[in-house]
């Protein structure tokens, strides 16, 4: 059976359209230039002399740089390693990576926010942006029946829901383990705009440095810049051969790596200045220390979130997650309690997840924003051009044969809903403010209530203290007088008693003052008061 003409033509012409893949990259060495850090822990708080593990002789190691200035090479060609495109070229400047005349490799794109001065990395990025815009233009301006934009590939790129949920769950677990308040109702927020990542230095007591790494690819260069460091004390610092500041008081431990390229396990980074590195080439003049990286999340309580949405003039500062959990780490280190294991393991797990997800999440968000901006600009340009080209046929809608060909922006509905919620909250805030002095007092009650009890106790003590003291003094005085009255008869019984003679009775009618008598006889209380007379009668 004979093949159709168009199938036969396609079969014949197919080899002419086959694209040739770039040659493999030659930035491979077999003399073991790559060595790893391995810290062996004898017991918590003591680090053995750092050793390093080299690959066996003949093991190929691929090395690529994340940034290469334009003045380091005259020409660059594409190469491929592990199904990834790289640039390769010979260095013409002694200060460039590798040295003069050495062939090195670097990534196809440089990291976000960097420029190589108009070199191949900038050109590749500009070419990629033009290709995306051209593809969107072709999809939108096709003359076939209008089917809308196909964003399925973009949706596959932006599937970050699972990674974000895992990141939030890990954060909440670590917060419950190290926070003394153990919050149950809170909001953990991750900003959509770019904010610096937070660096948490690795504690010296951490004993998880013995993980073996098997990798044959090394990326030399900063991965993240403009870091925010939580604290700069008790650091585990790295000392290279050309490190200038080796007496820094911030470092509690110094380790010396080998002179070749060194890399750290997944989840741990070198922090030099305000940049984070996965691998270093064995030379750094600035001080570098070991650190975790965590995203800039913010924790809100319900009241804090309400205050933030209402936008009051003075809002209470909310704690940032790394500082809250970092306080738990520092408290555990200072007091010797068992929080160091949970907090550092949490940081390690969170940093590991961030190590694999931060670039994908950031690239996805940037890609979405760039493509939406490009799509809006391209749609406006194409629509104006199509209206001009199809003006004689009644415009774009009649030319395409559709009743409605206008894009309805649904973001306006979301904006209206958010505005309604803000207006509702604002009305509630105004009602609270219009309730009079109690409205203002209610705002300060959470701050005043903890001090009302001690303040009232002090005032009551100052008012009624003197009265109570006087009552106590009078009570004690009365008790003393009563005791004295009870003791007075006993005291009188011990005094001397006087009597008159019994043989001279006084006249019942006579006055006491008229009686003339001699002084009474003095007798002792021990003698009887009545004595027998001379006749022997009593």
UniProtKB/Swiss-Prot annotation:
Keywords: Cell membrane, Cleavage on pair of basic residues, Disulfide bond, ERV, Glycoprotein, Membrane, Signal, Transmembrane, Transmembrane helix, Transposable element, Viral envelope protein, Virion. GO terms for cellular component: plasma membrane. Residues 380-396 are annotated as: Immunosuppression. Residues 1-20 form the signal peptide. Residues 465-538 are cytoplasmic. It comes from the Eukaryota. Disulfide bonds join 186-189, 186-405, 397-404. The chain crosses the membrane at residues 444-464. Residues 496-538 are annotated as: Disordered. Gene3D superfamilies: 1.10.287.210. A motif (CXXC) lies at residues 186-189. The record marks 317-318 as: Cleavage. Residues 320-340 are annotated as: Fusion peptide. PANTHER family: SYNCYTIN-1, VIRAL ENVELOPE PROTEIN. Ortholog of the human HERV-W_7q21.2 envelope protein. The genome contains a high percentage of proviral-like elements, also called endogenous retroviruses (ERVs) that are the genomic traces of ancient infections of the germline by exogenous retroviruses. Although most of these elements are defective, some have conserved a functional envelope (env) gene, most probably diverted by the host for its benefit. Belongs to the gamma type-C retroviral envelope protein family. HERV class-I W env subfamily. This is Syncytin-1.
């Amino acid at each position: 059976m004979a093949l159709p003409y168009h199938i036969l033509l396609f079969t014949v012409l197919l080899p002419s359209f086959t694209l040739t893949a770039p040659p493999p990259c030659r930035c491979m060495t077999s003399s073991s230039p790559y060595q790893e850090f391995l810290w062996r822990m004898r017991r918590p708080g003591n680090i053995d002399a750092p050793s390093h593990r080299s690959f066996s002789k003949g093991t190929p190691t691929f090395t690529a740089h994340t940034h290469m200035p334009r003045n380091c090479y005259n020409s660059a060609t594409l190469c491929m390693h592990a199904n990834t495109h790289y640039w390769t070229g010979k260095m013409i400047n002694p200060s460039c990576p590798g040295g003069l005349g050495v062939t090195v490799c670097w990534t196809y794109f440089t990291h976000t926010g960097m420029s190589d001065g108009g070199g191949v990395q900038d050109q590749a990025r500009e070419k990629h942006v033009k290709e995306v815009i051209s593809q969107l233009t072709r999809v939108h301006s096709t003359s076939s029946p209008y089917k809308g934009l196909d964003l399925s590939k973009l949706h596959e790129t932006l599937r970050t829901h699972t990674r974000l949920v895992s990141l939030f769950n890990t954060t909440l677990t670590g917060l419950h383990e190290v926070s003394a308040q153990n919050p149950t109702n809170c909001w953990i927020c991750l900003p959509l705009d770019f904010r610096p990542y937070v660096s948490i230095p690795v504690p010296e007591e951490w004993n998880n440095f013995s993980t073996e790494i098997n990798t044959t690819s090394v990326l030399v260069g900063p991965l993240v810049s403009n870091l925010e460091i939580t604290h700069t004390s008790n650091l585990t610092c790295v000392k290279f051969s050309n490190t200038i500041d080796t007496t820094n008081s911030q470092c509690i431990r110094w380790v010396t790596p080998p002179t070749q390229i060194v890399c750290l396990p997944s989840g741990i980074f070198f922090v030099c200045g305000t940049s984070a590195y996965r691998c270093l080439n064995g030379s750094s003049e600035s001080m570098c220390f070991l650190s975790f990286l965590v995203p800039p999340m913010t924790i809100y309580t319900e009241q804090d979130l309400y205050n933030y949405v209402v936008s009051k003039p003075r809002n209470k500062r909310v704690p940032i997650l790394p500082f809250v959990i970092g306080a738990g780490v520092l408290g555990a280190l200072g007091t010797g309690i068992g929080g160091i294991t949970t907090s550092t393991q949490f940081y390690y797990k969170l940093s590991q997840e961030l190590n694999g997800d931060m670039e994908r999440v950031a690239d996805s968000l940037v890609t979405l924003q760039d493509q939406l901006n490009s799509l809006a600009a391209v749609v406006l340009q194409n629509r104006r051009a199509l209206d001009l080209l199809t003006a004689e046929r009644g415009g774009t809608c009649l030319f395409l044969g559709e009743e409605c060909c206008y894009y309805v922006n649904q973001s306006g509905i979301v904006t209206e809903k958010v505005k309604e919620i803000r207006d509702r909250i604002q009305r509630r805030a105004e009602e609270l403010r219009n309730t009079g002095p109690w409205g203002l007092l209610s705002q300060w009650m959470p701050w005043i209530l903890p001090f009302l009890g001690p303040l009232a106790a002090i005032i009551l003590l100052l008012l009624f203290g003197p009265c109570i003291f006087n009552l106590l003094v009078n009570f004690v005085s009365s008790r003393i007088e009563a005791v004295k009255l009870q003791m007075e008869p006993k005291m009188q019984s011990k005094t001397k008693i006087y009597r008159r003679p019994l043989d001279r009775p006084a006249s019942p009618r006579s006055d006491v003052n008229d009686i003339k008598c001699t002084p009474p006889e003095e007798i002792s209380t021990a003698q009887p008061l009545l004595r027998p007379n001379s006749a022997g009668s009593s």
